[in-house]
Amino acid sequence: MGLVLKQFNRKIRTALILAPLFTFAQIIIDLIIPSFLASAIAVVFSIVTLKQKEASGEGVAVDFIAESKLSFQSVQEAQIVLATSVILLALFGLVFGLISIFCASIVAGNTSYFLRRKIFRKIMHITAPSHDQYGSSTLLVRLTNDVYLMEIMTFDFLRLIVRAPFLFIGGLAFAIATNSDMSISLAITFPLTFLVIGILNKKSTPLFKNNQKSVDQINERVEEDVSGYKVVQSFNLKDTECLKFKAANARWTKSSTNSLFVNTLNIPFTFFFSSMTIIIALLLVFQLDNSVRVDPLPDNAAIRPSIFAFFQYNFYIVLGLILTSLTMVNFTRSRVALGRIKDVLNKPEIQQHVVPDQTVLAPSLEFKNVAFGLGNKENRDFLQDLNFKFEAGKTYGIVGPTGSGKSLIANIIGGLYEPNQGEIFVGGQSIKTIDSDYLAKMIGIVFQQNILFKGTIASNIKIGLETREDWKHEPDSKKDAAMKRAAAIACADTFIEKFSDTYDHTVEQLGKNLSGGQKQRVAIARTVITKPQILVLDDSMSALDALTEKKVRENIANELPGTTKIIISQNINSIKYAHKIMVIDNGRIAGFDSDAKLMQSCDIYVKMKQAQKDQGGDFDAVA
């Protein structure tokens, strides 16, 4: 939270100070009002006696706090002053309360704003393994629900953390000052009240943790089923998935019911003990003071206002206890949420290397003794002993069975994963000594999953230019020309120009209104528009027909002749004309040579090629 406070400007810092101050001022007024009301009631019940004293010239004296008295010249003056005082105090209390709520709202709202901004920035910068560890659904809950709980806690802290204890302490002090005999009842019931509240709050912490886990689980369930809707439909898994959701929903319902039940028990228990306090107080007063009577005798009329004031302060005490209990409940929930937020914020970020005056490097790529793995210890070094070199300006292919580690290599090249051991060199220089921004601009990668952003085709293709300093101040006409050139390279112009609004055609979230092949071509155009020196195509033309794929490869070869091109595919026909082909099997290099030589030396390559040929692959077509 200290990091959030540093982001506050003068206005928010002022609100941070004013919120508890005005809350405290409101509490003082709330505590004084019952005493003025008790004095006003005393005037009403003792009006005959007071008028007699006024007529005799003794003046009018009315009981106030702690046996003090308010003196007036006449009964009428007492009535006017007391009534006016109560009205003015109530108005001031209202104004102070509104100001404190307004200030607390400003601070709480900005706390959630800065927290969300900080968490989102962290999500954008954490390492890929950390992102994989959480998953998008869990990160979404922490960015929204957990931050909202922190917003509530901030508001409660500024309002209730001041209001609750002072209402309790102030109410207790004024109750004792009003009627010490009746206050003995508080010593009997309050220990029991505190004991019950303490037990309930202790039980609430694990219940809220389980509830948050249930929220994560049901979000994961929904995200999986919604994103995999077509699979569910095609395999007729609707009933199966509904049963899984029913189980997750039942767990969430059970945890929510338990946590809500336990954390709302404090309210009825508190009111029960409050009622017991009043009953015990009345019994004590009747036992200790035999002069108390419920009759209109003037001598006993003064006790009635004190009983009224005591009951009012008892209400404040109860209110303070309830607010304290609710604050503790929210604190418990927010503490769990804060722990989950800190867990994300403490995750390591992708290391950025800043190298002033970065020299231009040749687009060669070399792996030396690289090992990497994800998940548990058994998979820690799934990729092992990767030693290879891609020369600048040439085309290379990476092929292998499903799950062999091809995409892991692509992610390592793209800088998403750092190897567990070994070194990577670009242009003969270790990537640890290369400026990170320079390296990111140097390497362009088109992933298997082509994620497009909501907007237009133009905004998606030109997104690669947004972070390029050399393009920031270029006119739109030049950017449009680069966009159309990139679309032509990716053969995306053929379908884009069929739209009535061409490049301004709307792209829905994740590109849902485009076909798989259209999304792949837009993704390729988005990458080649930046003219990367090293281009990685990770199975990114799988949805294209053979002729379109051939045309895209030719365009890339002709338009980016100096670029080192790395094509990852399961289809050997897509990469067999590369200068060299690297065969990956179970995370290791099984072969690295030309197509012709691999047919003589690599059994896995031969088997894959024969299997694809048996399935109808055309290996005689000209690439």
Swiss-Prot record:
CDD domains linked to this entry: ABC_6TM_Tm287_like
Record's bilayer topology term: Multi-pass membrane protein
GO CC entries: plasma membrane
Binding-site positions, ATP: G400, P401, T402, G403, S404, G405, K406, S407
Domain annotation ABC transporter: ranges: 365-611
The keyword Transmembrane is assigned to this record: yes
One GO molecular-function entry: ABC-type oligopeptide transporter activity
Cellular compartment(s): Cell membrane
Keywords recorded for this protein, A-Z: ATP-binding, Cell membrane, Membrane, Nucleotide-binding, Transmembrane, Transmembrane helix, Transport
Entry keyword Metal-binding: no
PROSITE patterns xrefs: ABC_TM1F, ABC_TRANSPORTER_1, ABC_TRANSPORTER_2
InterPro entries: AAA+_ATPase, ABC1_TM_dom, ABC1_TM_sf, ABC_transporter-like_ATP-bd, ABC_transporter-like_CS, P-loop_NTPase, Type_1_exporter
A Pfam match: ABC_tran
Domain ABC transmembrane type-1 residue range list: 16-325
Transmembrane stretches, start-end: 27-47, 86-106, 157-177, 180-200, 266-286, 307-327
SMART domains: AAA
Principal location: membrane
Similarity comment: family membership: Belongs to the ABC transporter superfamily.
Protein name: Putative ABC transporter ATP-binding protein MG014 homolog
Species classification: Bacteria, Bacillati, Mycoplasmatota, Mycoplasmoidales, Mycoplasmoidaceae
